[in-house]
């Protein structure tokens, strides 16, 4: 295998300092070398356990430390989760992600989590989970159950991280990514723009991700959704061009990764989203909610896809599953419900 050179902070900083249109042009060229620019991967994520999280992530309404009005819910029954997965597949999603507001999963819950993964896989969907910190044995059990992706975000740079989270170290996050990778599960890891970080911190986040032994297969880039009751509720809004620039740099640095528009899409107009796709974003969460924050309605996504000439990507998981793209084009026009908590996984 050819040696992959490591990025330096000065190189990443130079990318962030490029004139925006030059940066977009470079990012789109890189994107076209590795992906069909008209294809966008579509995921649905269900909150299988909501709220009452012991962590203190300052952006998160699911933390038990903040009064956000979020009603906590226990771990869903396996069949409830699988019924939601069936509906997601019928609506055209090709990947079903399951998120739980935990610091880490308890051993008593592992059999139920394994059954969820097995059931989702049996439908011909890709399976993804975000459950917090994992032990080696837990990662291996999920891998044996058939889990395709595990999400565990780094959130920001190592230098700024302590300003946002104190209940879990940066190294713990890196260790979980290593355990997931060693178990044979694909890695999904990204971060959040708008935490109060500097451009240098955004560069530092992408540097950490790109310089992992193997970069994440999926890189969600979130725009902070400010929730009343959280410590970051009064943060300044993120400039759209700054967000687009972050997408473009991520694409250039991780040319074969899927770069996902995640939380914050509800705050973006069509023009901003279009420029994000131009910058190399090629994955979205689809549906009405991102765990506990709004996401554009499904029919709006389809309308935007049509305006831009984009198509939902087909994913061959099991034979006979390629009709999902047609189902998406039909089902996206039906009214949305509040059943899904689709999210930039935390």
Swiss-Prot record:
It comes from the Bacteria. GO terms for biological process: biotin biosynthetic process. [4Fe-4S] cluster binds at residues 53, 57, 60. Its EC number is 2.8.1.6. One of its GO terms (molecular function) is biotin synthase activity. [2Fe-2S] cluster binds at residues 97, 128, 188, 260. The keyword Transcription regulation does not apply. It catalyses: (4R,5S)-dethiobiotin + (sulfur carrier)-SH + 2 reduced [2Fe-2S]-[ferredoxin] + 2 S-adenosyl-L-methionine = (sulfur carrier)-H + biotin + 2 5'-deoxyadenosine + 2 L-methionine + 2 oxidized [2Fe-2S]-[ferredoxin]. It holds the Pfam family BATS. Pathway: Cofactor biosynthesis; biotin biosynthesis; biotin from 7,8-diaminononanoate: step 2/2. Keywords: 2Fe-2S, 4Fe-4S, Biotin biosynthesis, Iron, Iron-sulfur, Metal-binding, S-adenosyl-L-methionine, Transferase. Residues 38-256 form the Radical SAM core domain. Binds 1 [4Fe-4S] cluster. The cluster is coordinated with 3 cysteines and an exchangeable S-adenosyl-L-methionine. Binds 1 [2Fe-2S] cluster. The cluster is coordinated with 3 cysteines and 1 arginine. Its cofactor is [4Fe-4S] cluster; [2Fe-2S] cluster. The keyword 4Fe-4S applies. Belongs to the radical SAM superfamily. Biotin synthase family. Homodimer. Catalyzes the conversion of dethiobiotin (DTB) to biotin by the insertion of a sulfur atom into dethiobiotin via a radical-based mechanism. HAMAP family: BioB. This is Biotin synthase.
